Amino acid sequence: MRRVALAVLFALTATPAFAIDANAPEQCITGPIEKTYGGTPWLVASCSDGKSLVFVAKEGGKAAPFEFDLTFTGNDYDLTGHGKGDRKFTDAAYADLQKLTGKDVLDLLNATKAAKPKN
C-alpha cells in the first residue's frame, strides 16, 4: 500500500449512481464521471466523507473488473486496489493515479458532484 500525499478542501452531496465495495466505511455513490487512466476507461465516484474517491474500471474495459480506492486518512491519502483486471492495465492506471495532485482530486470531487445521476 502506498500513500499519496495530497492537500485539498472538499464539499459534496450524494446521488445514487452505482454499487461500490460493501466493506468500505463510506458510501461512494456521488457521480459517476468517466475518466481515462492507464489508457483505459474508469468510472469515478466520490464518497460520503466528501474527500475520498473510488475508481471502477468500466465494464468491458481491459482493466475490468478492478477498483481503486483513494481514501482520505485525515492528513493524506491511501491508494489501494483490488480486482481481477489485466495487470498491465491496472498497473498503468495505478501509476497515473499516484500522480494526482490536490487540485486534481478537488477537480474530480467537484466533477462528480456536478454529474447528472445515471438511472
Which positions does each model-derived feature cover?
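Short, linear, compositionally biased motifs with a strong N-terminal bias
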Residues: 10-11
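Sec-dependent signal peptide recognition
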Residues: 2-7
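C-terminal partner/receptor-binding element of secreted or periplasmic proteins
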Residues: 83-119
